[in-house]
C-alpha cells in the first residue's frame, strides 16, 4: 500500500522541467499501479506567460495493452490546449494523422504533440457556444509501433462564470485507450445528460460525438424509446 512519487516543478529558470517526465520508463519486479499527470499543469505554452492551469491525471496501462490506432474527439478549448500527445515506446515510430505521415519519433520515450488543426474545426473561446450539431471534430491517428496516447481538451467557456478570457484554465488531460476488439459496442447509460453541472437551471450546451466504422448503424435510446 505504500507509494513512491516522482515530481518536477517547471519554472522560468528551468524550462526543461516542463517535459521532464514525459516518456519516463517505469519498470518493477512485481505488479504496480501507475498514475501520471499534473495537479496544476497546462498544455498551453508555459514560456509565453499564458495564465491558467488545471488538473489532468489518469492511471496508465502496461505496455502490453497499448496499441497503434486511436481516435481523438476535440473538446471546446482553445487550439493551444486541444493537442493530443503521442509517446513512443519504440524508436523510429511513424505517426500518421488522418492517413498522412506527419512525424517520426526517433527514440523510445520521446513524444509528438499533434497540432489541433488536424481536427478541422476551431471554436471561438470568447463565447459560450458549443460545437455545432453534425460537425465532424475527430482525428484518426495510427502509428507504426504501439504508443501511449494522451488527450488534453478544454471544457467550460469563459462566459459560464470562470472569469477568464482565453479558455486556457478550463482544461483536462487523460489517457486514451487504443481501438481494438475490447472497444465497447454499447454505452449504457448517461443519466440526466442535459443537466450537467451543479446548477439545475444551467443546461449543458455541448454535444455527444459518436465515431464509428463506415457502414455502422447507430441506435440512440431515450427513456426507453429509440
Residue ranges and their predicted role:
Residues 1-226:
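Conserved functional hotspot residues at active sites or interaction interfaces
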Amino acid at each position: 500500500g505504500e507509494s513512491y512519487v516522482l515530481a518536477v516543478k517547471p519554472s522560468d529558470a528551468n524550462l526543461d522541467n516542463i517535459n521532464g517526465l514525459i516518456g519516463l520508463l517505469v519498470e518493477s519486479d512485481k505488479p504496480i499501479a501507475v498514475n501520471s499527470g499534473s495537479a496544476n499543469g497546462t498544455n498551453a505554452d508555459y514560456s509565453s506567460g499564458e495564465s491558467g492551469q488545471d488538473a489532468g491525471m489518469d492511471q496508465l496501462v502496461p505496455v502490453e495493452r497499448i496499441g497503434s490506432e486511436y481516435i481523438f474527439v476535440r473538446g471546446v478549448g482553445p487550439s493551444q490546449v486541444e493537442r493530443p500527445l503521442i509517446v513512443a515506446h519504440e524508436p523510429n515510430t511513424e505517426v500518421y494523422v488522418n492517413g498522412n505521415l506527419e512525424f517520426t519519433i526517433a527514440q523510445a520515450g520521446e513524444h509528438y504533440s499533434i497540432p489541433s488543426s488536424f481536427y478541422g474545426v476551431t471554436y471561438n473561446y470568447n463565447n459560450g457556444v458549443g460545437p455545432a450539431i453534425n460537425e465532424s471534430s475527430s482525428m484518426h491517428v495510427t502509428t507504426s509501433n504501439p504508443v501511449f496516447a494522451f488527450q488534453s481538451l478544454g471544457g467550460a467557456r469563459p462566459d459560464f462564470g470562470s472569469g477568464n478570457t482565453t479558455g486556457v484554465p478550463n482544461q483536462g488531460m487523460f489517457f486514451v485507450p487504443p481501438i481494438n476488439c475490447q472497444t465497447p459496442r454499447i454505452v449504457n447509460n448517461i443519466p440526466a445528460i442535459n443537466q450537467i453541472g451543479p446548477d439545475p437551471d444551467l443546461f449543458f450546451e455541448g454535444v455527444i460525438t459518436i465515431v464509428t466504422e463506415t457502414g455502422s448503424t447507430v441506435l440512440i435510446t431515450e427513456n426507453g424509446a429509440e
